[in-house]
């Protein structure tokens, strides 16, 4: 079954393509079909993921899948949540002309600084990465498949590890005795919030859509 991935992220395409392969699905990015990215105006992961999936399905005429992910911190009432990617505001003068990768690195660093500042002196460091996956057969599908993965951890007071991106150097996973940034790709993909959500989605596709 061919599905449009409501993202233009090549790494996400590769990762989800591998994780969802047991369901017999083939993913293509919306960008490869000339589809622009959808707006994400909502306050919850599920609403944003559903909006993105519907947008991709309506524009392509194909089934679609979307994810919305982020970091939720208990002491901050679940924030940064859906604003995780843009938690900190960058000065336009500091990012003018930056290449996409350099811009992401600048944003990641600013996000981490703001998070550490917000948690300064806070004893409760519990947090989790959350991934919500939504798959639909058509834009008006009344029965979207919804899968949710949570990866529990604790936020450190400083960065540790050089791998990954975003908040990976700050979130320590006690069960693995390492931050996400210290894990190799195989371990991360086996335990991550996205892997957990994808495992659920494969089961849902098999039972509800009778795939693979």
Curated annotation (Swiss-Prot):
Disulfide bonds: none annotated. It holds the Pfam family Ham1p_like. Keywords: Hydrolase, Magnesium, Metal-binding, Nucleotide metabolism, Nucleotide-binding. The keyword Membrane does not apply. It catalyses: XTP + H2O = XMP + diphosphate + H(+); dITP + H2O = dIMP + diphosphate + H(+); ITP + H2O = IMP + diphosphate + H(+). GO terms for cellular component: cytosol. Binds 1 Mg(2+) ion per subunit. Mg(2+) binds at residues 39, 68. The active site is at 68 (proton acceptor). NCBIfam families: RdgB/HAM1 family non-canonical purine NTP pyrophosphatase. This is dITP/XTP pyrophosphatase. It comes from Leptothrix cholodnii (strain ATCC 51168 / LMG 8142 / SP-6).
């Amino acid at each position: 079954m061919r599905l449009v991935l409501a993202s233009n992220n090549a790494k996400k395409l590769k990762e989800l393509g591998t994780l969802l392969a047991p369901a017999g699905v083939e993913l293509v990015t919306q960008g490869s079909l000339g589809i622009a990215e959808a707006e994400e105006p909502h306050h919850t992961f599920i609403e944003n993921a559903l909006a993105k999936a519907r947008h991709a399905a309506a524009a392509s005429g194909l089934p679609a899948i979307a994810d919305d992910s982020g970091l939720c911190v208990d002491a901050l009432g679940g924030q940064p949540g859906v604003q995780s990617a843009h938690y900190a505001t960058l000065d336009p003068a500091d990012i003018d002309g930056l290449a996409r990768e350099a811009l992401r690195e600048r944003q990641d660093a600013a996000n981490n600084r703001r998070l550490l500042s917000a948690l300064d002196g806070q004893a409760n460091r519990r947090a989790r990465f959350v991934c919500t996956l939504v798959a639909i057969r058509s834009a008006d599908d009344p029965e979207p498949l919804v899968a949710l993965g949570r990866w529990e951890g604790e936020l450190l007071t400083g960065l540790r590890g050089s791998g990954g991106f975003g908040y990976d150097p700050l979130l320590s996973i006690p069960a693995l005795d390492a931050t996400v940034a210290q894990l190799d790709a195989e371990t991360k993909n086996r335990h991550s919030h996205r892997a957990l959500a994808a495992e659920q989605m494969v089961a849902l596709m098999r039972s509800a859509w009778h795939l693979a």
